[in-house]
Amino acid sequence: KDDHCKDLGSIDDDE
């Protein structure tokens, strides 16, 4: 999981 993903408002385990 990437913490920066949640920064975009979308938490994707894939990205």
Curated annotation (Swiss-Prot):
Q: Which UniProt keywords apply?
A: Disulfide bond, Protease inhibitor, Serine protease inhibitor
Domain of life, source organism = Eukaryota
Q: Which GO terms describe its molecular function?
A: serine-type endopeptidase inhibitor activity
Disulfide bond: present as a keyword of the record?
yes
From the record, what ranges are coiled-coil?
none
Q: Any keyword Disulfide bond? A: yes
Which cysteine residues pair off into disulfide bonds?
none
Q: How does it assemble?
A: Heterodimer of an 'A' and a 'B' chain linked by a disulfide bond.
**Family, per entry:** Belongs to the protease inhibitor I3 (leguminous Kunitz-type inhibitor) family.
User: Could you tell me what this protein does?
Assistant: Inhibits trypsin and alpha-chymotrypsin.
The protein here is known as Trypsin inhibitor B chain
